[in-house]
C-alpha cells in the first residue's frame, strides 16, 4: 500500500524536475512567442543556440521584429552576427528604418557597418534627417593683415555606401576649416569677407570636401563673422622692434671696437714715449763719449746747450700764449 502511494509521488516529482530543467534550458516561452508571430523555428534550433552559448532572445526577438516588418532575414544571419560581437537588435532596427525610408540596405552591409564600430541606426536616421555640424570659430588673415573669424554650420547626410572605411565628422570639420582659412587668406581686404560671407561657403563647397568621408555635404553656411586682431600691424611692430635691437647691438659693437682701438693707441703712445725716454737717456752718454774722443769740442757743446735752452724757452712761451688765448675765449 505504501509502495503504491510513494511510486506516483516519485514519478510526479521526476516529471516536475524534468519540466523545470526543460523550461530552464529550453526557452519554450520564446518558442511559443515565435510561433505566435508566424516565425517558423524549431525547438532544437533554440537548444542548439544554448549549446553554442548564444542567448536565444537576443536573436529571436529581433527575428520576430524583422518578420513583422516584412524583412527577409534568416536566423543564421542574426546568430552569426551575434557571435561576431555585433548588436543584432540595432542592426535589425536600422534595416527596418531603411526599409520604411526606401533606402537600399542589405543585412550584410548593415552588419559590416555595425562591426566596423559605426552606429548603423544613427546612420540611417542621418540619411533621412540630415545632421548639422557646427564648427568652432575659424581664424584666417586677409591680405591687409586683419584677422577674420568665421563660424560655419555644415549640413551633412550619411552616405551608407561609404560608412565602412570613410572618415568621420572630425575630417569634415578640419577640411572645412582649411577651406575657410584659405578663402579668407586669398581676400585682398577683410571688408570683402564681411560684405559677402557667402563667397566663403560657395568657394569651400565647390572643393568637394566630402570625398573619402562617410558623409555627403549638402550645404555650408557661415553663421557668424567677427574681426580679430590686426596681425599685420603686430608683425610690423615686432619687426621694427627687432630691427631696433639689431641696430643697437651693432652700435654697441662699434663703440666697443672704438674703445678698444683707443686703448690700443694709448698703449702705443706710452710705448713710443718709453722709447723716447730710453733714447734721451743715451744722449748724455753719447755727448760724454764725443767730448772724450775729441769728436766734439767745448764750443760745440756750448752751442748745443744754447740751442737746448732756446728750445725750452720757446716751449714755455708757446704754452703761455695758449693759456692766455684759452682765458680770453672763456
UniProtKB/Swiss-Prot annotation:
TM ranges: 5-25, 28-48
Protein origin, superkingdom: Bacteria
Keyword Plastid appears in the UniProt entry: no
GO-annotated cellular components: membrane raft; plasma membrane
Membrane topology: Multi-pass membrane protein
Entry keyword Transmembrane: yes
Cystine pairings recorded for this chain: none
Pfam families with a match to the protein in the record: FloA (PF12127)
Keywords: Cell membrane, Membrane, Transmembrane, Transmembrane helix
Location of the protein in the cell: Cell membrane; Membrane raft
Major location category of this protein: membrane
InterPro entries named in the record: FloA
Similarity-based family: Belongs to the flotillin-like FloA family.
Job description of the protein: Found in functional membrane microdomains (FMM) that may be equivalent to eukaryotic membrane rafts. FMMs are highly dynamic and increase in number as cells age. Flotillins are thought to be important factors in membrane fluidity.
NCBIfam families for this protein: PRK13665.1
Subunit (UniProt): Homooligomerizes.
Protein name: Flotillin-like protein FloA
Gene for this chain: floA
